[in-house]
């Protein structure tokens, strides 16, 4: 396993906030404040120190970041990714997955023939949506539930869906 496979993306710095070097953090944890309980690292596995200042109406966290104290320094952090070590995360239940483990997962049809792969996982507030890239390079969005994906393993997912061609 390479070093990035040992990391789980848990947040990204969206922008700066104010003149004191605060950042707006988009957390991928549920609840969003759960990210503050993790030991955060960057891609080089260097420790990151984040402290919560407040939370805005969108659920984004306004935080201090390491020793950043000016708006100019904070502006340079836009897009900065925050990770935690996979080994530090809790064990999952049988039907639970980390998004990082689903990305690029092979998708099979009911006859176990490869039909594509997961291209992206989206969530607009009503549940996870899976973007599938089919072998013909077309994509479709489907809800991530047992009706469409009755079987998911670490190696593949079974798709219960007939495409309109």
Curated annotation (Swiss-Prot):
A Pfam family: PRC
GO biological process, one term: ribosomal small subunit biogenesis
Domain PRC barrel: residue ranges: 94-165
Transmembrane segments: none
Subunit-structure text: Binds ribosomal protein uS19.
Function: An accessory protein needed during the final step in the assembly of 30S ribosomal subunit, possibly for assembly of the head region. Essential for efficient processing of 16S rRNA. May be needed both before and after RbfA during the maturation of 16S rRNA. It has affinity for free ribosomal 30S subunits but not for 70S ribosomes.
Protein name: Ribosome maturation factor RimM
Organism this protein belongs to: Rickettsia canadensis (strain McKiel)
